[in-house]
């Protein structure tokens, strides 16, 4: 496994602006746009170490494509978390699984004035004409997509804000509207769906009460429905108020609750129904659509929430550790009533799934899912291959290279394409053998390498990003 953990989960990546990266192979002549990515820029502050892959200080990465060339820039998000860490040499704010060392007095004060991290490092999106770095806290940070300079905190409407949100908003391009889910913690907590439109007030569309809120990293959306999958990893909100331990360590796995699907009518905001299933866990929904009188929900599922603990850095540094396998499941919810049931679409290990969202979100004709995976011959360590799964046939295509650890595969469709998979896959790959990273460009149909652009340094393991054609970098 060489020095993969230190390279992928280590110290700060230097901030750089590079006009031209060395390119091997041939870039598509139609690829004119920008890949923006978000993730941790360091897992250490001074002598202190963050504890979990979902911790760290946010860094943005930008790969821009021109004729036969790729440029690169990266920059830390200039948040309070980052600025105070730089000034003091210490971790300043509580993160997903890391709590700053505090005196007893400091812990008592944190109960009355908890310092929520603004290190928005998980994903990014273009919402209401702004580019936002997204976190699971309600503090989302606007940035300039050209310079990567931090603009400031994006303010939601007071009626929308909760204490937790997903980093995977859904988009309805036909109506220029985005949707997201927030959780408000209280004596009776609520899940709330809201919409965001440029030039308009944000609107709460629906809410569901709950006494023990679940950890939900994403939610589903079909043509006519929102889907909240309430995994039985739940919290007593009082424990969060006391702030005695890091955020995720307040949650408990309660499999006796099962995993209900809450389905909401997109057009009326009314609850359609609750559809029970056996307990399982997931970070990522993939797609959802109506098929006859059934609602189909595809997601990457685990039998329990042990994957959360598997991402603690001390476990990821263990050369013999193996990640729990996430698998692509298709759940069918009978809208007339009854329990949800599922079928397995592939035996392949999967995480960080992507598909052609632009054309096939909520579309029953969608077929291909791309994801990071673990090679069956090299199961120890971290995600070390990419897979393409055909949801109709179960066929799996792979990309794997020794000592290489790819990140989220972003699909970019060829302009004017007819076939769903006519395009390329972009993935930032850590090359542990060389001690650097490179941007991999795969042909999405054959899954063969077309090109790679090599960086002079390793990029820490991040999470999510997106590709923006040249013109949409200008806000709508």
Spans of model-derived segments:
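Beta-propeller domains
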Residues: 1-476
């Amino acid at each position: 496994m060489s020095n993969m953990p230190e390279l992928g989960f280590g110290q700060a990546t230097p901030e750089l602006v590079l006009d031209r990266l060395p390119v091997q192979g041939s870039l598509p002549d139609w690829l004119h746009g920008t890949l923006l990515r978000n993730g941790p820029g360091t897992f250490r502050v001074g002598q202190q170490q963050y504890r979990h892959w979902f911790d760290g200080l946010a860094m943005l990465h930008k790969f821009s494509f021109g004729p036969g060339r790729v440029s690169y820039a990266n920059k830390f998000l200039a948040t309070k978390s980052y600025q105070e860490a730089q000034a003091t040499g210490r971790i300043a704010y509580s993160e997903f699984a890391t709590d700053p060392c505090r005196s007893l007095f400091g812990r008592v004060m944190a109960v009355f004035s908890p310092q929520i991290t603004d290190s928005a490092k998980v994903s990014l999106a273009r919402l209401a004409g702004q580019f936002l770095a997204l976190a699971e806290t309600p503090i989302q940070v606007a940035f300039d997509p050209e310079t990567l300079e931090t603009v400031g905190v994006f303010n939601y409407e007071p009626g929308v804000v909760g204490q937790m949100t997903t980093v995977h908003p859904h988009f309805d391009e036909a109506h220029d509207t985005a949707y997201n889910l927030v959780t408000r913690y209280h004596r009776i907590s609520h899940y709330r769906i809201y919409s965001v439109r440029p030039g308009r007030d944000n609107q709460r569309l629906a809410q569901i009460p709950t006494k023990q809120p679940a950890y939900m990293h994403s939610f589903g959306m079909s043509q006519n429905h929102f889907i909240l999958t309430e995994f039985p990893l739940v919290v007593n909100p009082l424990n969060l108020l006391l702030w005695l331990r890091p955020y995720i360590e307040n949650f408990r796995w309660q499999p006796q609750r099962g995993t209900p699907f809450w389905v909401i009518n997109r057009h009326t905001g009314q609850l359609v129904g609750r559809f029970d299933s056996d307990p399982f866990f997931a970070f990522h929904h993939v797609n959802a659509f109506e098929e006859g009188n059934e609602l189909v929900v595809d997601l990457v599922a685990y039998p329990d929430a042990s994957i959360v603990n598997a991402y603690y850095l001390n476990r990821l540094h263990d050369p013999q550790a193996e990640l729990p396998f996430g698998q692509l499941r298709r759940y069918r919810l009978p809208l007339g009533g009854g329990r949800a049931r599922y079928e397995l679409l592939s035996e392949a290990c999967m995480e960080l799934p992507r598909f052609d969202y632009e054309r096939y979100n909520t579309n029953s004709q969608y077929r291909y899912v791309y994801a990071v995976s673990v090679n069956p011959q090299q199961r120890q360590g971290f995600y070390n291959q990419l897979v393409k799964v055909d949801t109709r046939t179960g066929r799996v295509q792979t990309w794997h290279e020794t000592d290489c650890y790819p990140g989220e595969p972003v699909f970019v469709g060829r302009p004017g394409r007819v076939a769903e998979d006519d395009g390329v896959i972009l993935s930032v790959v850590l090359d542990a053998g060389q001690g650097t990273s490179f941007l991999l460009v795969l042909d999405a149909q054959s899954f063969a390498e077309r090109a790679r652009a090599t960086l002079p340094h390793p990029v820490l393991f991040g999470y999510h990003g997106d590709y923006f054609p040249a013109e949409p970098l200008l806000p709508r």
